[in-house]
């Protein structure tokens, strides 16, 4: 990371350990933003750029990440129960210890994602669709 990149990162709002439940972040550029330990239950991240974001230990149950770019995000030990991840780009994420129960994943791209084996198997049973941004099938991206 160069000096210019660090300066850009410092301009981002830090949402660490905050309550963002039902917050509206639709379409926003939140690349490299920290939501570590944040509560974002029911929040709207539809179409947001969350590339490289930190969502570690966050609670995002029932949140809407439809069409969002979550590539290279740190999403470990987080709650994504019932989350809408349809058509989201989740390439290269680290999501070990996270829960994706009842998440909607049609068209999501999980290429090179680090997931718990049990989550991967469960998601494979629900995998359907092709990501409109990357052209990759959800089933294939999960290595099913």
Predicted segments — roles?
Residues 1-143:
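Tandem repeat scaffolds
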């Amino acid at each position: 990371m160069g000096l210019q990149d660090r300066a850009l990162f410092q301009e981002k709002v830090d949402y660490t350990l905050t309550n963002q439940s039902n917050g509206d972040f639709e379409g926003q550029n939140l690349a490299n933003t920290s939501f570590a330990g944040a509560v974002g239950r029911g929040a709207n991240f539809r179409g947001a750029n969350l590339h490289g974001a930190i969502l570690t230990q966050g609670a995002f149950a029932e949140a809407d990440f439809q069409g969002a770019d979550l590539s290279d995000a740190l999403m470990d030990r987080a709650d994504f129960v019932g989350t809408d991840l349809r058509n989201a780009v989740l390439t290269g994420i680290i999501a070990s210890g996270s829960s994706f129960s009842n998440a909607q994943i049609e068209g999501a791209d999980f290429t090179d994602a680090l997931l718990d084996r049990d989550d991967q198997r469960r998601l494979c049973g629900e995998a359907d669709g092709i990501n409109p941004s990357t052209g990759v099938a959800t089933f294939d991206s999960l290595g099913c």
